[in-house]
């Protein structure tokens, strides 16, 4: 992870809970939580999965503008998964095109030069979204609550007069019996049929995570919509419109999962992933 601010810290905690080895680069942070390793930028970029979450600034001695350029891009492995969900200006378009030419899998939410982004780059990334950032139903509710608190304080009125009850829960029944099938979307590498029980167990957990996450936000559908609209008019206004009219979606914490049969291991991994309730 490049950046250990609010988002980077929360993501690191989630990944550690899921059993991942997490390395973090952030020159402004000197203490990290248990299970997280603080490393130099080159070591962070050398990981199999690299995800950017740093703020964008030009302040020395550690400017982040164009942090990953034609020089540092060489630190990234050819077989890596590279995600930018931080700021578009953290990496140059040239660096991303270089990565794509080497076979690196690119998942891009924040783009260099946005809203005027590279059509060539869009065609080369595995998953593309229009700077969704923290947009969700929960974010809208929280922002509204913040305004309500100020309104109540300023006008001296009762919260009950202005605050409405909003149900955020998303119920889901998960059929455990079908989770060991190799039917996970092609974007995920899975073991073949007949592999060891340990691999089948891992596949079951992977499928459970995939179905749970897709129940609240399907990035494959977001990617398809982005490409369809963008290709019809690849201009700045299209990108801005996609951001402004992004569909409402829930967060995984809203999900309430009922398993079709008792599986403590699935309860553990779904809870670690942030599912609100599993039983």
Which role does the model predict for each range below?
Residues 1-16:
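Glycine-rich adenosine-cofactor-binding loop
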Residues 17-34:
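NAD(P)-binding Rossmann-fold cofactor-contacting core
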Residues 22, 50, 126-128:
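Short, well-ordered beta-strand core segments
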Residues 29-119:
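Rossmann-like adenosine-cofactor binding region
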Residues 79-82, 86-184, 195-266, 273-278:
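Rossmann-like dinucleotide-binding domain for NAD(H)/NADP(H)
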Residues 186-189:
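Charged low-complexity "KEKE/polyampholyte" interaction tracts
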């Amino acid at each position: 992870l490049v950046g250990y601010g609010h988002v980077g810290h929360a993501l690191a905690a989630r990944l550690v809970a899921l059993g991942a080895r997490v390395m973090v680069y952030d020159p402004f942070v000197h203490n990290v939580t248990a299970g997280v390793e603080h490393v130099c930028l080159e070591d962070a970029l050398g990981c199999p999965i690299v995800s950017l979450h740093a703020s964008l600034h030009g302040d020395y001695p550690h400017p982040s503008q164009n942090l990953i350029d034609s020089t540092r891009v060489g630190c990234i492995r050819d077989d890596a998964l590279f995600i930018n969900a931080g700021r578009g200006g953290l990496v140059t378009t040239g660096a991303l095109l270089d990565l794509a030419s080497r076979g690196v899998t690119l998942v891009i939410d924040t783009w260099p030069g946005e809203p005027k982004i590279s059509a060539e780059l869009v065609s080369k990334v595995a998953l593309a979204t229009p700077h969704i950032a923290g947009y969700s139903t929960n974010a809208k509710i929280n922002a509204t609550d913040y305004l309500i608190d100020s309104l109540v304080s300023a006008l001296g009125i009762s919260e009950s007069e202005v605050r409405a009850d909003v149900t955020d829960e998303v119920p889901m029944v998960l059929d455990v019996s079908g989770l060991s099938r190799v039917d996970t979307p092609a974007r995920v590498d899975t073991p073949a049929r007949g592999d060891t029980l340990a691999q089948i167990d891992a596949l079951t957990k992977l499928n459970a995570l995939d179905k749970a996450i897709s129940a609240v936000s399907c990035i494959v559908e977001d990617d398809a919509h982005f490409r369809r609209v963008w290709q019809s008019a690849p201009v700045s206004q299209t990108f801005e419109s996609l951001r402004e009219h992004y569909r409402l979606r829930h967060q995984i914490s809203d999900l309430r999962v009922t398993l079709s049969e008792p599986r403590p291991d699935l309860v553990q991994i779904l809870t670690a992933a942030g599912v609100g309730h599993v039983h």
